[in-house]
Amino acid sequence: MSMMTSTPTKRSVKLDDIWPELEEGIYKIITDLNKGFPKQKWIALYTHVYDYCAASQSKSSAKVGMPKQQASGANYVGEDLYNRLNLFLKKHMSQLLKLTETKMDEPLLNYYYTEWDRYTSAMKYINNIFQYMNRYWIKREIDDGKKEVYEIFILSLVIWRDCLFTPLKQRLTNSLLDIIESERNGYQINTHLIKGVINGYVSLGLNREKPKETILQVYKSGFEELFLTATENYYTNESAKFISENSVADYMKKVETRLNEEVKRVQQYLHQNTESELIAKCEKVLIEKHVEVIWNEFQTLLEKDKIPDLTRMYSLLSRIPRGLEPLRTTLEKHVQNVGLQAVSSIATNGVIEPKVYIETLLKVFKKYNELVTGAFRSDTGFVASLDKACRRFINENAVTIAAKSSSKSPELLARFTDFLLKKSPNNPEESEMEQLLNDVMIVFKYIEDKDVFQDFYSKMLAKRLIHGTSTSEDLEGTMIGKLKSTCGYEYTSKLQRMFTDMSLSRELLDRFNNHIEQVERSSLNIDFSVLVLATGSWPLQPPSTNFSIPKELQACEQLFQKFYQNQHSGRKLNWLHHLSKGELKTKYLQTSKSGYTLQCSTYQIGVLLQFNQYETLTSEEIQESTQLIDSVLKGTLTSLAKSKILLADPPLDDEEIAKTTKFSLNKQFKNKKTKIFINVPVLTQVKEEIDSIHKTVEEDRKLQIQAAIVRIMKMRKQLAHSGLMTEVISQLQTRFNPKVNIIKKCIDILIEKEYLMRVEGKKDHYSYVA
């Protein structure tokens, strides 16, 4: 048996009693809120809504024994009030719509935006009046799945959308598009108005699941799609007309301006999500559709060095797929041709100065590197094109073709480096040297035969160290450091050991001098120094001739030989007289009381000291006393005669020196300088040295190729011919480009030596023989 209980009741509130006052207040708020609304009136309206919705609680009842949650469920009312407000708002929309019938374009937009702003502001106010209904009756209806029920402010937007916006949508959108087009045509527009109307499109994108958020469906379907189509049509027509009447450079400026305008347009009054689609549409119409015309202008702009236009072209074409690829190819060909022409212009006489050659290469590189890093923003594709072009014109050009050798570039680069690092009145300032050495490394990066550079460089470094002609050891160390960072430790290991030998030689010479003073208790009577250099580290050739050292120098050599053998009993000294030098003091001249100091090679010293005993000597007599071979003797006598230290009888010409040619000291010798350098290198010796280096390089390459083949096959065990060729080239191309025919010969050599064998049954396959 159940028992009913009653609760105290509240006064019943009828809708018809409260609605007239609610309607009057709502109308006042909707139409004239800007004049203010009394707080007491607001409280009264809120109380009406509260009383009406809460009145049903007094009618609720509970049964004894009912579950708690069931008993507490409130039967709030509100449907009639909700429907009454719904009808009121729809009637208001109908009145607003009627007032738009004669309006179009900006007047229509002005009216619409004014009413929208008034309406949304008012409905936020009214929403607060109906807050109690929102929290209880409306929430319950929504929770129960009623699709047609909304919170009051959302309801107001739904009614605006369905009753006013939808009928006006086409006229509104057309008006917006017309005004935006007029702005594109250069007219001033009210961007605040446009932004306000468009924001209304966005606000009407209601999200049922998340009422406080909007979706862009209304904005996209009602405005954005039509706007993008209008944009495409506008720029299709404009671009076709403009490019037919103006230059490509002017067209690119126009496109750049238009793209910037569209970005600004989004910022001023469009939704931010529109930007990506809008710009993509503009890029397709303004750039992609005219890309062939733009590509075709690139070569002309390169030739005329139109940097601003090239910068703009890169910026525009980088926006579209594959827009830059033809430019990269064109740039590569252009730079290669410019480089080849530049080298050809300085190679007309067949003789090229290293400084002129390297500066010419660098001038081309720097010009286009500045273009790539600046206008093309260090784009990796353009960097690669520049690298390919430089590699081609640096390794194969008029100079290398004339020399019939791609190794000419590394040789000239080594000579240019020697020019920088060797003492000279023309040496650059030390502050400039770091940049100049960096310039050397730029060209070094592109030369293919880095082993040729290494051989020439080490040869020249050896001469600078032996003859003491380096600008500074710090700069020498800097250059070696740069080579090491580029090519690794192995590339510079011998160069670094050369410096070690120089340091050890200085220490050894100090000990020798102490030994002479303290042990031998004698004086050498001459200023004697010696460098002890390890054979494996120095690129030095043994002398090509015998040489009978003058008796004046014999004591020095013998004492040092004895001292060194006592220090290092297991080592052997080989004297390199052809690299040695010294100074002689003249005491025979009638023209100078103080005399001259002659800086000579040891061979020249050997010849000149003969004249301490004899007034005149024939070539044959000099050869007998010095033991020099004909070619070396001729070069030595020629250099002394050309320096006018010796007089020849008969005078020398380009023919061979006869054995009977007589030589005597020129006692009338005069020179403005007191210290005279006569160790002039002979051109034939330089040529022989170059030939020797190239021969050494070729032999070294064969050994390196064989070593690479063995390494690869030891790891792979078995490999096809093509695969082996590819791996060998890959391993060695950082030092030089191995030629295919040389690799084949090296494979045959290794098969003969039984390091490799051909695989039976498999054509062109090799296996490693353990």
UniProtKB/Swiss-Prot annotation:
> Is Ubl conjugation one of the keywords UniProt gives this record?
yes
Sequence ranges assigned to domain Cullin neddylation in this UniProt record:
700-761
Cross-referenced SUPFAM superfamilies, in alphabetical order?
Cullin homology domain (SSF75632), Cullin repeat-like (SSF74788), Winged helix' DNA-binding domain (SSF46785)
UniProt xrefs under PROSITE patterns:
CULLIN_1, CULLIN_2
Q: Does the keyword Ubl conjugation apply?
A: yes
Subunit arrangement? Part of a complex that includes culA, fbxA and regA. Formation of this complex is dependent on the MAP kinase erkB.
In the record, the note on similarity to other proteins reads: Belongs to the cullin family.
What protein name is recorded for this chain?
Cullin-1
| Lineage start | Eukaryota, Amoebozoa, Evosea, Eumycetozoa, Dictyostelia
Which gene produces this protein?
A: culA
